[in-house]
């Protein structure tokens, strides 16, 4: 593994994680007592006598990487280092890097946007799946849904509006039949572009998003199966709508790493 200036020492990384998980003082994850004793790299609660570590009650409990290698992978993922580049940096296999990138993606917070004012809506096709995506014009707010199959109908479009578009909004789409008469099903002011007539003004932003997604996924992941489309679209949309979460590994961990509830 390469040694890079942006990768902190193991001691510093442990300090970051301890502060994120426990705050100023380490406490027992079970009884919350602060009478804990440190024994090498683990802690022992004087009250309930359980042993624990910095990561034992988090989603990193099974981590077998060194702290610095873990930080390098997380840093690579936050700045969108492609899989193959991350393999060279870390010395890990393709499968290992993909597993860690998947884990980081899985722990992104939930994000739900209700689009309003002017909403551009379109669909794109990926082998045996369809992606319906809406964008609030002039903003970073996206809403999306992945459907199995390549034949979406009006029911799918209307269901999308029910859950993701505010009543009274302006809806701009292409001339697809699934949008015809849609304002009778949900209160929107609907306008259409007919692409055969070279009309693109109403859907330019959302169609551009599909192009950006395809470029991003090929560059960062090289390839992915359509069955995993939803996972990658979620990451892409999160990066677009909430780029601040990816400012640094430390900021990402501060929003995603915490003690898991104990029954």
Question: Language-model segments: which ranges?
Answer:
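Residue-level recognition of single "structural anchor" positions
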Residues: 1-263
